[in-house]
């Protein structure tokens, strides 16, 4: 087999594999099978998200250590992909709380252009699936970003603000806990400063250290909420 044919062969099967598991349900399939039933009184939390969640446990493993926290972030994912895998990666684990942090990759058009209302709708659908399964919900704002290194032609500021406004209003109307990372972390250009995210999108350890007490406060609020 010549070199060009071999490359084409590899690319074909890589694309075919992605098409067969668009939502990457296989990523956590084995891990999920090993998760035990919740212990009595356990306040299990699943973190559902994209690379910002995925990289969190790698950047600050101590935050997750010894806690009933399950990280189910997958780098690059859009809200549609998360919605497809929500049952396997959240509901099946029987948490008390799910923390949803999503939307930045939709704004970046990782899977092509998306209507902002559809991005919001995917997050709302995850929240409603959780509620139907007696799981408390924390809806996180999209983090600040004023540019994407991998999509330099896109200015994300207006899209992020619009989705965050929809999420905040939706959470208030439906009794979900809203976690406003944006206000706490945005600089005067509606982005993340280099100390919080070297590439302007993915938090540094310092960035995650700002997020950690905020998310734990939100989880505590969700646990005592009526919804």
Positions of predicted regions on the chain:
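Glycine-rich anion/phosphate-binding loops
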Residues: 77-84, 114-122
């Amino acid at each position: 087999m010549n070199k060009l044919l071999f490359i084409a062969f590899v690319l074909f099967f890589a694309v075919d594999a992605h098409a067969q598991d668009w939502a990457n349900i296989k990523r956590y399939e084995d891990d999920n099978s090993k998760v035990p039933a919740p212990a009595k009184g356990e306040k299990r939390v699943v973190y559902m998200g994209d690379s910002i969640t995925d990289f969190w446990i790698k950047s600050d493993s101590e935050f997750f250590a010894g806690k009933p926290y399950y990280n189910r972030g997958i780098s690059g994912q859009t809200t549609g992909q998360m919605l497809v895998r929500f049952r396997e990666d959240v509901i099946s684990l029987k948490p008390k709380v799910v923390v949803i942090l999503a939307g930045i990759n939709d704004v970046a058009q990782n899977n092509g252009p998306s209507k902002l209302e559809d991005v919001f709708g995917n997050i709302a659908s995850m929240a409603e699936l959780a509620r139907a399964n007696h799981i408390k919900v924390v809806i996180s704002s999209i983090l600040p970003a004023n540019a994407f290194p991998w999509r330099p032609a896109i200015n994300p500021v207006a899209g992020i603000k619009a989705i965050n406004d929809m999420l905040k209003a939706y959470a208030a109307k439906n009794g979900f806990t809203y976690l406003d990372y944006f206000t706490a972390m945005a600089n005067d250009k509606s982005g993340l400063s280099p100390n919080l995210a070297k590439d302007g999108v993915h938090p540094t350890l310092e960035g995650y250290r700002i997020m950690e007490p905020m998310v734990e406060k939100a989880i505590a609020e969700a646990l005592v909420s009526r919804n």
